[in-house]
């Protein structure tokens, strides 16, 4: 696997260890691996200002595309930079709509589950 750029970490940066899972066929675009234990930066550059801000689900999605997904078919996971409609997201077994959706700030030990509810026929 080649080197992939990620947000630079300073010596004072902290990492969050989280579990990310993919089901419903999504695992096929994430190296055919259902469960990933990741250490991600606790802060991520803001898309608007470039300043560090606490890592959110939106930042995690970008991180996953840049650092975990090897498949080139990003459109199966995201549309216009957001999680594709038809993909259920659970944060610690709760619907992400209850947690603030893409604005939810990732916490140490979180379990984020992406479930595709779309199936070909």
Curated annotation (Swiss-Prot):
InterPro entries according to UniProt: Beta-grasp_dom_sf (IPR012675), Mopterin_synth/thiamin_S_b (IPR016155), Urm1 (IPR015221)
- UniProt protein name: Ubiquitin-related modifier 1
| Any Gene Ontology biological process | tRNA thio-modification
Q: Pfam families, per this entry?
A: Urm1
Q: Which UniProt keywords apply?
A: Cytoplasm, Isopeptide bond, tRNA processing, Ubl conjugation pathway
Its localization reads:
Cytoplasm
Per the record, residues carrying 1-thioglycine are 121
Cross-link position per record: Glycyl lysine isopeptide (Gly-Lys) (interchain with K-? in acceptor proteins)? 121
Question: SUPFAM superfamilies per the record?
Answer: MoaD/ThiS (SSF54285)
PTM comment for this protein?
C-terminal thiocarboxylation occurs in 2 steps, it is first acyl-adenylated (-COAMP) via the hesA/moeB/thiF part of UBA4, then thiocarboxylated (-COSH) via the rhodanese domain of UBA4.
Query: Which pathway features in its UniProt record?
Result: tRNA modification; 5-methoxycarbonylmethyl-2-thiouridine-tRNA biosynthesis
Q: What does this protein do?
A: Acts as a sulfur carrier required for 2-thiolation of mcm(5)S(2)U at tRNA wobble positions of cytosolic tRNA(Lys), tRNA(Glu) and tRNA(Gln). Serves as sulfur donor in tRNA 2-thiolation reaction by being thiocarboxylated (-COSH) at its C-terminus by the MOCS3 homolog UBA4. The sulfur is then transferred to tRNA to form 2-thiolation of mcm(5)S(2)U. Prior mcm(5) tRNA modification by the elongator complex is required for 2-thiolation. Also acts as a ubiquitin-like protein (UBL) that is covalently conjugated via an isopeptide bond to lysine residues of target proteins such as AHP1.
| Assigned protein family | Belongs to the URM1 family.
Q: Cite a GO CC annotation.
A: cytosol
């Amino acid at each position: 696997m080649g080197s992939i750029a990620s947000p630079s970490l300073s010596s004072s940066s902290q990492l969050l260890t989280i579990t990310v899972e993919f089901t419903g066929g999504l695992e096929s675009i994430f190296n055919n691996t259902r469960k990933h234990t990741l250490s991600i930066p606790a802060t991520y550059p803001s898309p608007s200002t470039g300043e560090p801000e606490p890592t959110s689900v939106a930042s995690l999605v970008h991180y996953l595309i840049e650092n975990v997904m090897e498949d080139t078919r990003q459109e199966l996971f995201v549309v216009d930079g957001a999680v594709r409609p038809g993909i259920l997201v659970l944060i610690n077994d709760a619907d992400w709509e209850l947690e603030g959706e893409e604005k939810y700030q990732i916490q140490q030990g979180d379990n984020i589950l992406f479930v595709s509810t779309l199936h070909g026929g």
